[in-house]
């Protein structure tokens, strides 16, 4: 499964950022045609994003576009433009049901047919931003083979709860756990919401550590400075890597000997621990954490 620790939001109407945001090296670039774009700039932003998607340097990084809802006047126009331009992943906003996913899947299928793009090559990411969506997270996660993951959109969700975001994020715990459980059950990835105070590095790291501990695959970002911080947090330490190698070596040796039980230093090593060691080694390919 592709490494997607960081998804950097880039406003679709910001020509300067569109021209060079690949230099920050997030795992995915997410061009935004929805909330970050004023109504009067929707059409020009769509053209800018379509042009950026065809830039050779954006072929070397995964591209995601958050389109406007299909039931808006801009949604289908956005979708037609970005699918034809070769976007890797379409981010659905405000997903509240499996039917929302199916409708988007069908629309993408028709566009792929019309432009000659390989069927199924356009992937989807469903953003859940309401209490209704959270209650339907499991159905949403299983709704389409195009889905690479589901993501939490906190601002609308918290407003609908009739509360506000706190430094501790306690108001998001149920939503985060619901999204994570649904994603894991469906075998797809789970992504956390943005941390909106770009100047609060300590607060960002605290929240990022929390979602990593919960089990999230990555996080949406609004500031390039957050990318390195997040990648370093998700990276294993050298000590982690060395222990993971010992676990894998013990498992390989046990299999070679036909032993039914894997042990290391007198302790039994079961399948979940071996799987965790494999994940550590996979993450280590992208860097070792600075301690």
UniProtKB/Swiss-Prot annotation:
Binding site for substrate: 66, 129
Superkingdom as given in the UniProt entry: Bacteria
Keyword Lipid biosynthesis: no
Gene Ontology cellular-component annotations: ATP-independent citrate lyase complex; cytoplasm
Cofactor note: Binds 1 Mg(2+) ion per subunit.
Chain residues that bind Mg(2+): 129, 156
Reaction(s) the record says it catalyses: citrate = oxaloacetate + acetate; (3S)-citryl-CoA = oxaloacetate + acetyl-CoA
A GO molecular function held by the record: citryl-CoA lyase activity
Chief location bin: cytoplasm
Record localization: Cytoplasm
Its EC number(s): 4.1.3.6, 4.1.3.34
SS bond partners: none
Cofactor: Mg(2+)
Keywords: Cytoplasm, Lyase, Magnesium, Metal-binding
Matching Pfam families: HpcH_HpaI (PF03328)
An individual GO BP term: acetyl-CoA metabolic process
PANTHER family per UniProt: CITRATE LYASE SUBUNIT BETA, LYASE BETA SUBUNIT, PUTATIVE (AFU_ORTHOLOGUE AFUA_4G13030)-RELATED
Functional note: Represents a citryl-ACP lyase.
Family membership noted in the UniProt record: Belongs to the HpcH/HpaI aldolase family. Citrate lyase beta subunit subfamily.
Protein name: Citrate lyase subunit beta
Organism: Haemophilus influenzae (strain ATCC 51907 / DSM 11121 / KW20 / Rd)
